[in-house]
């Protein structure tokens, strides 16, 4: 199992970037790895997810590495814009983020792109919760949060639920907890892929 296109490069500013692309229709699913992760993922979870989404919906899937906390702004934006231009500009965007990839998606990606739907898995809630709330009220998209019951942020999920019942766009958020799952969904790759696959609902 491989990507149609896979590339790794080092930018002039020293940022290492890597991505894998599967070509499909005008629906683009962007998958952002957790901190330090490559575009394939442990047990090939991002690649497997990308192939499943493509085989099921015919969509284009772009998997992005995550070698820096600001890698989306510094490298990914240009890659995504180039892909959109190559596809003629009329596309529908979806986003899946894992851990820090979720944080970069919510805090940064929503400033650059309009997503129809986002799935954010085990996004850390311990730091800068006020920034998360601000981003949620700003982001005009449907968001599904997924947390493993063993994730360090699970004790903060009630605060997220409370905010989602009171504030603007937060009311559109869906929050799911997964029994038996830790931060990495260790031994539960199939469940991880299943949860993320809900990014498209047709």
Spans of model-derived segments:
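Gly/Ala-rich beta-loop-alpha elbow adjacent to hydrolase catalytic centers
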Residues: 96-105
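Alpha/beta-hydrolase active-site loop
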Residues: 45, 70-88
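C-terminal catalytic histidine-bearing segment of alpha/beta-hydrolase fold enzymes
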Residues: 73-74, 169-202
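Conserved alpha/beta-hydrolase "acid-adjacent" motif
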Residues: 152-159
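Short beta-strand/loop motif that positions the catalytic acidic residue
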Residues: 139, 145-147
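Short, surface-exposed "cap/lid" segments of acyl-processing enzymes
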Residues: 13-14, 22-66
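Active-site nucleophile loop of the alpha/beta-hydrolase fold
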Residues: 119-128, 148-150
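N-terminal cap/lid segment of alpha/beta-hydrolase-fold proteins
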Residues: 1-24
């Amino acid at each position: 199992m491989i990507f149609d296109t896979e590339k790794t490069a080092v930018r002039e500013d020293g940022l290492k970037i890597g991505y894998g692309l599967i070509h499909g229709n005008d629906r683009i699913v962007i998958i952002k790895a957790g901190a330090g992760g490559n575009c394939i993922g442990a047990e090939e979870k991002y690649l497997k997810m990308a192939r499943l989404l493509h085989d099921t919906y015919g969509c284009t899937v772009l998997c992005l590495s995550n070698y820096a906390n600001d890698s989306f702004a510094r490298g990914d934006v240009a890659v995504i814009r180039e892909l959109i231009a190559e596809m003629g500009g009329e596309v529908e965007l979806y986003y899946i983020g894992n851990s820090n990839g979720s944080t970069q998606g919510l805090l940064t990606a929503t400033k650059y792109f309009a997503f129809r739907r986002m799935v954010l898995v085990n996004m850390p809630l311990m730091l800068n919760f006020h920034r998360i709330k601000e981003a949620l009220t700003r982001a005009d998209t449907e968001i599904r949060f997924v947390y493993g019951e063993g994730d360090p942020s699970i004790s903060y999920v009630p605060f997220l639920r409370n905010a989602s019942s009171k504030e603007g766009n937060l009311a559109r958020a869906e929050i799911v907890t997964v029994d038996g799952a830790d931060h990495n969904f260790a031994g539960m790759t199939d469940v991880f892929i299943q949860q993320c696959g809900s990014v498209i609902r047709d």
